[in-house]
């Protein structure tokens, strides 16, 4: 069969559609946001592909995977096994890195274990093997009278009962062994748990250092070395000294090297992980800047919020500080910033030499005692360790930040592991390289002789994976980068590279906007990668809005014609050229140039004020100075990884939130920022969910639900029954269904199977009890209203201005199709961001608000971008300021001011390439953004000339 045939697809808003998708082709599904693209691609095609695969498994295997629901459709034929590559950043584990999720780090560990050269952690000298005489001499260096045990390690951290090993030791004539640090005699019956890791060392000899011991010592050392294949452990009662025939420092430093193995380089294994931070590379510690949120305040005013704001101990803490001030002779009403540095350090970290006198007088009691001053931070650390309350733990952690581990300096591994080098490069240095630099290192790595035979297959795997990652446009990422810090687009492209590396054939790949976060320059690489996946013999189905990807596809499906209830149909399907000529296709009109997002005729002058970021040097920023004019739409551009988000989110937003909004945020490294007096509020409108539970919805988030509940409470029927606004809330007792507690569904725990959700039988999913649902407005009860789309509700509430105004803002941002009570968890990142924008639009303007948006065009069609642009312009026209981080040229060309970062990503970025109005940026040759803007302005001029 040459195509995937779909008949009668009705999932979500799909209108009983029929569509044929050619197999082994690059197929793009496009259309307005909410038109049904994901419903077709993921909820129908992928879901059915997955379901059929699971159905083919045995009943035993299926019980662990659960029952998969069949999508609502009549027929689907020609389906291949389906793999979905979505935008979600799934790796929230702090131990996951780019290196681990791509499996490159697994091969690196193998490479360093097999061809790495160990060096002494103390002096850096290459480690050499020791002879028996050298080992004996090292033991003889212990002082006279020292009591030593000479041990031979035979099992090192391996699971099993090890009966045969213990039996052999017994037969060899030894009486004692040390098992997991405990001395045991072989006369007793030793039973080990087979699922637990065990270390076993033979006790070869126990000696006291004295004259004439050399001969006995040499014999014991030789015996130990034979039993353990070249390793001897000296136990002096306080620590173990590992000496090896294979590895020893020629300068005599005591080092703990065992045989090199891959687990030595794993920060997830106790054999490789730094013991201080357990391989995390950082420690959660109390931060001075978070504890003292406002240095302008004094101790009396509560500058140390964690003590001053404590409900239970606030009086005690303030009395402690008052006694300390009497002792150190400082005033409690002096602003924190004006106190001497030594005094501030004493207040925070304590001083055991200082004794505080306490004098508490109550109505019937009087306490007097003296106690050493503990200090704010030691006090909080002690209470943090002692608490068993999750809420208290969270409260403490709000004053804490991650700091690099003092032992491993953030490198995650033990110093012995960090001392192993391949061509003078330790493993931590390799992982600090960008993918592009690591690829270059591997290509130029020369190994010879026996090493070449061992390293060649390992290097081939590393080289392939690095090449695939570089090809999908993430060459600027480092292998040590935390997987949780990746954007959705970056995470998706990494998974895409992994799939290409698997070289599967006959698979249906379904991708969700892989171009997210990519500069136009890197799009060509991505399209080539998708074509490579197709050329392997796969069908590649991409939900995408990027023009270049559409034009390079083999087949284009345009969904619509509108969004939500107005969508769900196939407007047209064909080659990109055929779609661009279709008269009813909105996508076709934009592809052919018949419709365009307009370029503003005039740029804003701004209000004359600006924000000045001076000396920014967080991550890859190169100590740069940047001016952000206020009262304008400012767009930050640059290739992926050039430092845009670091500059705006990590430095500017965090600094402004701390200074202006008094939030507990820590800004990235910079010298200073000037101009905060020109703004009174800063709002980061990101793509995070509007709520974490199904109880959150657009009505609750935008504030619509309150006036709607008040309106219902004001109805005659509600007044007669004595119902207030709370009666119409599903979050509190009274009007909600108590069986499901207002959820409408019940969760049934299935233990080893996934939880099952069933509709509540009492309220039939309506969330409210019968009495509440009897109160109606225009024939509709509160449940009916929550089920309405924004578009329907706008007509329904046309006579209630406060509700209508909020609904109109949702319509303005193109969300007329969403339901008022739609669970927050069902919205895409782009939809969540536009709900937040609508909420801001409905507020009264102050004219001094700074808005920050990071890639707001994610998930948006050309037409959605045009609508979004109008909303952004409306907010700026009210006198506010806006900073947008964006790659979409339709937004960039509308900017009043552009800051272009680069020139490359990662180490090659972090500089300001150009600042100015769009037409000036277009003239700058070394600006990648400028090169693409130049094409747009040249094209627009040609069209305007033809029009004239």
From Swiss-Prot:
GO terms for biological process: nucleotide-excision repair; SOS response. One of its GO terms (molecular function) is ATP binding. A zinc finger (C4-type) spans 249-277, 737-763. SUPFAM superfamilies: P-loop containing nucleoside triphosphate hydrolases (SSF52540). SMART domains: AAA (SM00382). ATP binds at residues 31-38, 638-645. It is found in: Cytoplasm. The keyword Signal does not apply. It holds the Pfam family UvrA_DNA-bind. Keywords: ATP-binding, Cytoplasm, DNA damage, DNA excision, DNA repair, DNA-binding, Excision nuclease, Metal-binding, Nucleotide-binding, Repeat, SOS response, Zinc, Zinc-finger. The keyword DNA-binding applies. Residues 307-586, 606-934 form the ABC transporter domain. One of its GO terms (cellular component) is cytoplasm. The UvrABC repair system catalyzes the recognition and processing of DNA lesions. UvrA is an ATPase and a DNA-binding protein. A damage recognition complex composed of 2 UvrA and 2 UvrB subunits scans DNA for abnormalities. When the presence of a lesion has been verified by UvrB, the UvrA molecules dissociate. Belongs to the ABC transporter superfamily. UvrA family. Forms a heterotetramer with UvrB during the search for lesions. This is UvrABC system protein A. It comes from Leptospira interrogans serogroup Icterohaemorrhagiae serovar Lai (strain 56601).
